[in-house]
Amino acid sequence: MNNEQRGVALLIVLMLLALMAALAADMTLSFHSQLQRTRQVNHHLQRQYDIELAEKLALASLTQDVKDNDRQTTLQQYWAQPQQLQLEDGNTVKWQLRDAQHCFNLNALAKISDDPLASPDFPAQVFSALLINAGIDRGNTDEIVQSIADYIDVDDSPRFHGAEDSFYQSQTPPRHSANQMLFLTGELRQIKGITENIYQRLIPYVCVLPTTELSINLNMLTENDIPLFRALFLNNITDADARVLLQKRPREGWLTTDAFLYWAQQDFSGVKPLVAQVKRHLFPYSRYFTLSTESISDEQSQGWQSHIFFNRKQQSAQIYRRTLQLY
């Protein structure tokens, strides 16, 4: 073999070595990528298991508390206390159940009358009063109430101050009214008359539940909820009046709505004309709850928010929606 042939052979060997090195590097990268994906899947499955465990424990405590006392839902009960559990794998899971009925359910506006000559339905009157208490100009209340009602009702006929598809299609970007119940309070931002300032003023007092009922738990209202509390009485009571009524609540909570309204009438004359209407929307117990769960590991945290309906007749709880929380 001459020098030229030896050179060619050496070049071929070097090319083969380079190819083998490239293949080895590619296989190593592929292996590391696959290993990383496997780890991520395992971490995700573990966090999902942690969260499901917390859900089961939270629902069990809620169910037991209702069995022990099915007439009241209060913050003194065990279900309302924050919980934490250290798992064998080193992860920590935390959870907190919260009542979801110390707020105005926006979906209650779906049923209000569209007759411009009729007196406003009580939920519409309550919401108008709440808007005023939240610092929103009285001149904007009709537009906001009717626009929300139009956005979630099933027809395409706008109310006098409301808006349907004909309005939303002219916006940028064009869009449609939902024609169904709201799923998130953030949907308010899409509705005619709701500015960011109005949204931020409203958000502490409103919620969305999968029902068109307006049902508020009188045992869950605090001084932070005074604007809503006053609105329930169409602002016939002052902030100071509302504070007095909240302070009269027994430590273990009101046992019945009648007991609360009896004392309210004794102290404040503005309550009496509204007793029959308020009684239909004020209760000493809750059926809707929100569970916030967080799974914490050395690498990262993941949280879920589970939305719960408790069937009091069957004394069973079910999760009807979950949303991911980022940390």
Curated annotation (Swiss-Prot):
Main localization of the protein described in the UniProt heading: membrane
A Gene Ontology cellular-component term: plasma membrane
The organism's place on the tree of life at top rank: Bacteria
Induction (UniProt): Silenced by the DNA-binding protein H-NS under standard growth conditions.
InterPro entries in the cross-refs: GspK (IPR005628), GspK_central_sf (IPR038072), Pilin-like (IPR045584), T2SSK_SAM-like_1st (IPR049031), T2SSK_SAM-like_2nd (IPR049179)
GO BP terms, alphabetized: protein secretion
PTM description: Cleaved by prepilin peptidase.
Subcellular location: Cell inner membrane
SUPFAM superfamilies, per database record: GspK insert domain-like, Pili subunits
Additional record remark: Part of a cryptic operon that encodes proteins involved in type II secretion machinery in other organisms, but is not expressed in strain K12.
NCBIfam families found in the cross-reference section: T2SS_GspK (NF037980)
Protein name in UniProt: Putative type II secretion system protein K
Encoding gene per record: gspK
